């Protein structure tokens, strides 16, 4: 296939027991997410009185409905930790591996709580993130040995820079990653002891340090400034150069390209390590790809082996110890834990090449990347999977011509059941960035309210636990837009 596979691509029914990936499969014509029957979230009341029910729900739920499946986050973290542990053992790699959650992908409380509970270190990038870290400290969820990585722009005197100093007083393992020399005075004058990271300008395709310097990116320090910053940190009382940060891209699905981009940063780390022996962590940042379509193919173990082996080779050449490895996993951690379910409310032929299935929500508001970037996500029916399919187009309920799926000019076909009564469908792999970009509890395009949200977890015995968060009310939407506020108007004469 030369196009992203976003769902079923045949007119025939889907066989019972068919598995789309490691968490979506078919049971008697209905779609299951792990052990959760998604169809029965909506159809419970329509089945026999003694039919399936879920503890804590016991009734049909409204559509649209957002699903937050927390066990998936734990599975993803555990899987990556196991991958790097296997690679370390196979290669005899002397350094450690640190898994950090990049919180900008999804900063919801239940997500942060789950990542910390799964043993992840914590990465942040804004002043509000610092407040979140304080809340996690107060609740006993951020242990003293857990690293907090402070990325983002934080010039001296800004609220973010000042908040980092406050957090350092409460949490010892805080590492500010310097983006610009203007960030150093706050650390130098604080009277506090800091382990410090330096972000190198490494983003984008390159084969050596010169090409990294030439690339047009606002992130990180160029080579000359990097070395200058390292000397300042090393000479400063109370500061210790600890981390080199070299992020090279986002959603990099080609292992060869990923390692090719990381090689010059690893060489820079080794040269720095020759001069500054306190430097011990190589942080490759983000870029780890996540499966958002059904054709996803990336060998995480092969990547880990290649990365560690490359570090061994380069560090051996420069006669320095291999570094501890850190990755900041945002999309990888959260993409698959989130899904968004809708009901097909009408079908329009409209003399189109394929019939329009109109859903009871907005595609472009719920998944901004579909219209802004032409991004693809998995779309599957929850019901009627044992019935014939046809190729269709999806339309959102808004009056916007961009509220469609597949994205405009996409080569990917979308097939859904011909039978449309009680036809529910889900978008999957949408748990990273989409809700944050769309604005949580904010005002949506065409004044659509935010959907209800079902948070799903499991206890130690594997029993499901549910928490249903109500969607926005009309009053909340109007209040966001200022209609429930009495405004003082001041008239002026010209």
Feature-to-residue mapping (PLM):
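Flexible, glycine/charged-enriched surface loops at secondary-structure junctions
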Residues: 63, 89-94, 275-281, 317-326
């Amino acid at each position: 296939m030369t196009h992203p596979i976003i769902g079923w691509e045949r007119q025939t029914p889907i066989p019972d027991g068919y598995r789309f990936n490691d968490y979506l499969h078919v049971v008697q014509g209905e779609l299951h997410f792990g052990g959760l029957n998604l169809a029965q979230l909506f159809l419970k009341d329509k089945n026999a009185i003694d039919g399936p029910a879920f503890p804590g729900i016991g009734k049909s739920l409204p559509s649209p409905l957002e699903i937050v499946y927390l066990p998936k986050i734990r599975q993803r973290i555990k899987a990556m930790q196991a991958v790097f542990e296997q690679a370390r053992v196979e290669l005899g790699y002397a350094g450690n591996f640190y898994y950090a959650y990049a919180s900008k992908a999804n900063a919801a409380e239940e997500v942060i709580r789950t990542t910390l509970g799964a043993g992840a270190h914590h990465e942040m990038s804004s002043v509000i993130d610092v407040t979140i870290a304080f809340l996690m400290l107060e609740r006993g969820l951020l242990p003293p040995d857990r690293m907090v990585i402070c990325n983002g722009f934080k010039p001296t005197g800004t609220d973010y820079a000042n908040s980092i100093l406050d957090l350092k007083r409460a949490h010892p393992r805080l590492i500010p990653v310097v983006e610009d020399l203007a960030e150093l005075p706050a650390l130098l004058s604080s009277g506090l002891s800091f382990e410090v990271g330096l972000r190198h300008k490494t983003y984008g395709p390159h084969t050596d340090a010169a090409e990294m310097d030439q690339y047009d990116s606002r992130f990180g320090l160029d080579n000359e400034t990097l070395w200058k910053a390292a000397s300042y940190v090393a000479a400063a009382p109370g500061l210790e150069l600890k981390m080199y940060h070299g992020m090279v891209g986002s959603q990099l699905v080609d292992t060869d390209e990923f390692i090719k981009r990381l090689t010059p940063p690893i060489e820079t780390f080794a040269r720095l390590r020759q001069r500054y022996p306190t430097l011990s962590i190589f942080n490759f940042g983000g870029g780890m790809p996540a499966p958002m379509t059904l054709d996803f193919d990336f060998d995480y173990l092969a990547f880990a082996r290649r990365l560690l082996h490359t570090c061994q080779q380069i560090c051996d050449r420069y006669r320095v110890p291999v570094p501890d490895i850190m990755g900041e996993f945002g999309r990888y951690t959260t993409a698959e834990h989130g899904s968004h379910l809708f009901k097909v409310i009408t079908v329009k032929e409209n003399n189109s090449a394929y019939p329009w299935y109109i859903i009871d929500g907005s595609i472009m508001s719920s998944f901004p990347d579909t219209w802004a970037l032409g991004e693809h996500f998995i779309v599957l029916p929850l019901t009627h999977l044992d019935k014939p399919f046809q190729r269709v187009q999806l339309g959102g309920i808004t009056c916007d011509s961009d509220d469609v799926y597949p994205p405009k000019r996409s080569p990917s076909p979308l097939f859904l059941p011909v039978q449309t009564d009680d036809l529910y469908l889900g978008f999957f792999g949408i748990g990273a960035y989409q809700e944050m970009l769309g604005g949580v509890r904010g005002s949506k395009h065409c004044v659509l309210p935010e959907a209800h949200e079902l948070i799903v977890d499991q206890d130690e015995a594997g029993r499901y636990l549910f928490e249903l968060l109500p969607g926005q009310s009309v009053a909340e939407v109007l209040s966001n837009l200022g209609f429930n506020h009495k405004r003082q108007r001041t008239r002026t004469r010209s």
